[in-house]
């Protein structure tokens, strides 16, 4: 939500988790090098969105480089396949450039507690987390944008609309919008799993979920890719939609600015995970983004206790939601249990969407480490 007088300068990194233990070795040397040799070149705000592509094309042609992504709807600029040192040299004196930001890693943000396999099938289960926030309710006619690892496009318990979707991956095994990890499908299930007698039911059952794939099969991605996903949502979402971001990394001004701009332009609500490092959420992005349509969510357990892993701090945290031992969907059918602010954010996303940005609350998180107990969202 709207937060003022907040200066952020501390840098940190979202660590890999044991839920997706392979995150720690994501990418290997080859992809690490690709990220290290990508620079986000931001143009000045007065550059017209209609001129961005032409300017980017001309710049990379002269530098004998390539633009991996071009941003024209939120921030303006591009991600180019060279280090920022080389980019600064190549584009020295270009009056359209505001600044250069090195690309970096972004992760899905489940907690360090290991996920447990669930059952699934018949009969349908209503997760405790859904009940705790006042669900399920009928979400037919509503839309949630899941900015994540993709969604299982053929899942029988989801209403997926891939026609409006996006993938930051244009080639290789991660191309397309299908979920190669399971994280995005779990998130989508919490928001809107169908009330159809199987698996689980979501908070806003039957909500149309749109995959915006910015994380790969190992639950990892890049700032440049996430920016591209947010840029897509900015011009495709409608007022009252919800965009969920259960991901994060170190503090990144470009992403915060993009999320704030996308929320302002589209009229959608952006709901983001606070993160799982037991630190102040002001240190990480997009949790530290500030806008009256951006909501940062901490996590609680089934006894309304503040989750030991959850980031904290008011601002930027706005509300808490259930995030420990959360049952939801897995790829291919059935269910699985995960923990994290990744699981809290989609529950809040559904509530905020159904309440048009004015969620009710029911109780507060006990043992909040910042001493200012977060209110728990409720329909």
List each model region and its residues.
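Structural recognition of the beta-strand scaffold that forms the well-ordered cores
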Residues: 40-42, 79, 99-101, 143-147, ...
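Glycine-centered tight turns that cap/initiate beta-strands
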Residues: 93-99, 157, 267, 291-296
């Amino acid at each position: 939500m709207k937060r003022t007088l907040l200066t952020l300068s501390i840098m940190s990194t979202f660590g890999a988790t044991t839920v997706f233990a392979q995150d720690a070795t994501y990418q290997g040397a080859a992809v690490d090098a690709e990220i290290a040799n990508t620079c986000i070149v931001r143009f000045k705000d007065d550059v017209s969105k209609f001129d961005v592509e032409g300017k980017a094309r001309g710049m990379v042609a002269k530098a004998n480089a390539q633009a991996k992504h071009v941003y024209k709807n939120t921030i303006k600029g591009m991600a180019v396949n060279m280090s920022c040192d080389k980019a600064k040299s190549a584009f020295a004196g270009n009056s359209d450039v505001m600044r250069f930001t090195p690309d970096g890693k972004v992760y899905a943000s489940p907690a360090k507690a290991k996920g447990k396999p669930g059952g699934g099938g018949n009969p349908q289960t209503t997760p405790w987390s859904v009940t705790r926030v006042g669900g399920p309710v009928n979400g037919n006619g509503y839309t949630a944008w899941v900015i994540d690892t993709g969604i299982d496009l053929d899942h029988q318990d989801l209403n997926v609309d891939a026609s409006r979707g996006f993938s930051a991956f244009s080639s290789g095994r991660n191309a397309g919008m299908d979920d190669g990890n399971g994280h995005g499908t779990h998130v989508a299930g919490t928001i809107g799993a169908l009330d159809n007698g199987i698996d689980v039911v979501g908070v806003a059952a039957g909500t149309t979920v749109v995959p915006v794939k910015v994380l790969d099969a190992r639950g990892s991605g890049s700032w440049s890719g996430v920016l591209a996903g947010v840029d897509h949502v900015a011009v495709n979402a409608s007022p009252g939609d919800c965009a969920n971001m259960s991901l994060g990394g170190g503090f990144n001004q470009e992403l915060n600015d993009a999320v704030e701009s996308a929320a302002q332009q589209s009229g959608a609500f952006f709901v983001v995970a606070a993160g799982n490092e037991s630190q102040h959420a002001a240190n990480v992005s997009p949790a530290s983004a500030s806008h009256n349509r951006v909501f940062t969510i901490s996590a609680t357990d089934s006894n309304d206790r503040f989750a030991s892993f959850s980031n904290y701090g008011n601002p930027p945290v706005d509300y808490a939601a259930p995030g420990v031992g959360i049952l939801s969907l897995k790829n291919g059918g059935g269910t699985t249990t995960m923990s994290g602010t990744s699981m809290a954010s989609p529950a809040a996303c559904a509530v905020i969407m159904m309440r048009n940005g004015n969620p009710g609350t029911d109780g507060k998180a006990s043992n909040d480490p910042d001493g200012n107990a977060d209110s728990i969202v409720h329909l």
